[in-house]
C-alpha cells in the first residue's frame, strides 16, 4: 500500500478520509488554546496514536516553543512502562504534530464515573503513579503538573503519566521558582511564590491525587479560589471517616505544609498502605543514583526538524532557532523517516514508525537495565526555565464542585481548627545564624575581599525573591579559580541561613567526575572562618 498523496502538505482527503502525514485522523480527544489532540491511525499498520497538534502560529511565541521543545526532550529521555511514549515528531504548514502512545481513558473520567474508587483499585493506580514519579526524579525531572487529567489509563488499569509541558530539570543545590499548575493541585510553596524543590511539589501532587481517588473531591475545596489557596497554605482539610487509617496517615504525610516535613518518594514506597497485599519479592529495592544516557528512537519529518530538538545534530542548511517549513508532501511521507541520530534510513519500513518505540520499551534491555547505565545524562542547562503563573481554572470535577457549593450556601461555613504549630526542626541546611541579615552581608563582603575574591550580586530579574539574596564569586586557590554561589535565606524574623555551593557556570571550568573537590572545600573553610 502506498502513502496517500495530495497537493496539500497539511492533510489529504481520500474517499472522505483526512490524513496528516502518515496518520488517518479520527475523533478529537481534547482541545486547548494552543493545541488539540486527535486520534490517529497509521495508514498501513492501523496502529492507534494520540496526535498532539500544536498550532504553528502559537510556536512563534518563544515561551510556547521552549515548552514544546522541553516536552519532546524529556519524553525522549525517559523510558518507563508508566510514562507515555513519543513515537514521532513532524511538521505541516498549520501544525507541529507529536505522535504519542494512545490510551483508552484518563483518571479524571474514571473518578467522575465512579464518584470515588475503592482502596484496592486506588492502590493499584497509585503505585504506578509513584513509580513513574520516582523514575522521573531519578533522571532529575520534576513533573510539576500532576492532576487527574494527566494520568492516562487503559482497560487493564495500566497507568501512563503524560503532559510534561510544565516539567523542568533539577540541578544539584538549585531550587525552582516558576509558579505553574492548577490551583487545586498547587503546593503551598508554589502558591506563596517561594523557591521550592520539584520533588517536594510532586509529592504534594501525589497526595492530592490519592485524596481525590479515595474521597472523590478536592481536599481544599471552597467557595472561591482565594479561599482554596488560603486553605492550602494553612493546611486546613479533613479526611472522611470511611478512608482507612493507614491511607489517612499517608495522605497527611504527603500534604504537610512545610516541605522539609513532607514525606519523600522513597518513604512513600515503603509505607504500610503502599506495600499492602504486595508480595515481598515484588517490592522494589532502594534505587541507585545512576543515570541513563540512552534516548528513545523518535522519527522527525522533515529531517531538519530534528535539529531543533537536539543541538548535537548539525545541518548546513538549517540552524537552531529557525523553524523549517516543508516544501512538498514528500517531507511528510513515512518513506523518509529520520531518527534522532541524524541519519536517514536506507530501507525504511512504515511499521517502524510505530513499533520502534515498542521494541525499545519491551525488549530485553528494559528500563531496569537503562537505570544501571551511568555513562551520563541529558544536560538540563540547554533548556532554560519558562516563566508562568498560577492560573484560575474551573474545577476538574464540576458535579462535585456544584454539590459542594450548594452545601456551603445551605449551611453555615465551618472550618476545622488550625493544626498545632509544628515543632522546630533539629536539622537545617547551610550555616544558620541569628545575626541581622545586613550584618551578615557586611561580614560576607569583608571576608570575600580579604580572600581576594571577585564577586557580584545576582541580576535584577532574580534579585531577592522575598526571602533570598544571592552572590556570585570567584576565589583563587592554589592558582586554580573556584567559582561559588553564596545564598542568604531568611527563615524567620530572627534567623538566616547561608548556603555555599560550587558553581560550574563559567566556561573556563566544567564540573566532571575527575574534578577534585578539595579547592572548593579549602575555600569554604577559609570563608567560614572569616565570617564566624
Swiss-Prot record:
Annotated spans, Disordered: 316-349
Chain positions recorded as ATP binding sites: 29-37, 52
InterPro entries registered for this protein in UniProt: AMPK_C, KA1/Ssp2_C, Kinase-like_dom_sf, Prot_kinase_dom, Ser/Thr_kinase_AS
PROSITE patterns: PROTEIN_KINASE_DOM, PROTEIN_KINASE_ST
Location in the cell: Cytoplasm; Nucleus; Cytoplasm, Cytoskeleton, Microtubule organizing center, Spindle pole body
Keywords: ATP-binding, Cytoplasm, Cytoskeleton, Nucleotide-binding, Nucleus
Polar residues: compositionally biased ranges: 316-346
One Gene Ontology CC term in the entry: cytoplasm
Active site, UniProt feature: 145
GO molecular function: ATP binding; protein serine/threonine kinase activity
Entry-linked SMART domains: S_TKc
Pfam families: AdenylateSensor (PF16579), Pkinase (PF00069)
Lineage top rank: taxon: Eukaryota
First-listed, main subcellular location of the protein, grouped into a coarse class: cytoplasm
Gene3D superfamilies xref list: Kinase associated domain 1, KA1, Transferase(Phosphotransferase) domain 1
Domain Protein kinase: from-to ranges: 23-274
Free-text note on domains in this protein's UniProt record: The protein kinase domain is predicted to be catalytically inactive.
Protein name stated in the entry: Protein kinase domain-containing protein ppk9
Gene source species: Schizosaccharomyces pombe (strain 972 / ATCC 24843)
Lineage: Eukaryota, Fungi, Dikarya, Ascomycota, Taphrinomycotina
Gene name tied to this protein: ppk9
